[in-house]
């Protein structure tokens, strides 16, 4: 075989292009991956008993700081879950675990969550277009109230924009989804669309976070983020 022919050089060019593309993607980090499509948070690779890697922690409202950890859970898809363990009963207290290096306006976020315990609340949710700990949208499910609600949080104050009342069973995994496209927000629960909301308060790109309330001990699994055009 003649190694100097045009087919040979075409093959070499293709291989080099593939290697270069893979190298650029690997070196670009989480932001580049998020901009090109879907990421799934690798909870199964996180260290048990430690704070979940790739997240920054904050709080809306009053009360003590949250306690986020990686917990062993054989019912989780990878045997581990992200858990908020603090039982501070301050009612207007909303712990946030903000995913690092991701900013998007249009996206689809899905999680599995399990409400483990809580006297004041047993809630878990997703925050999007997060500017800071006091300004964002959030959808949350509550096992004590058997409902799902969508809020905007402006300067630390919540305002409900939509809701539905499905059964939210404690100590059982449920799926919660939020799709944000421009002014339209679509909320899904256990694979079914619940309701839609129109709002223009936060139009710019912002962060994505896991969210809980008050003394909720909540576990999170299968966090998937898909950026949209």
Annotated model-derived regions:
Residues 37-38, 202-229:
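Ligand-recognition surfaces built from glycine- and aromatic
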Residues 188-209:
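Short, solvent-exposed beta-strand-to-loop segments that form ligand-recognition rims
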Residues 48, 84-149:
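Secretory/extracellular carbohydrate-interaction modules
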Residues 33-61, 221:
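Extracellular carbohydrate-recognition regions
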Residues 43, 109-111, 172-187:
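Short tryptophan-centered beta-strand motifs in secreted/extracellular beta-sheet-rich domains
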Residues 50-83, 90-92:
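Extracellular glycan-recognition surfaces and repeat-rich motifs
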Residues 154-175:
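Short, aromatic/His-centered strand-loop micro-motif at the edge of beta-sheets
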Residues 95-102, 162-168, 210:
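Beta-strand-rich interaction surfaces with strong enrichment in secreted/lumenal proteins
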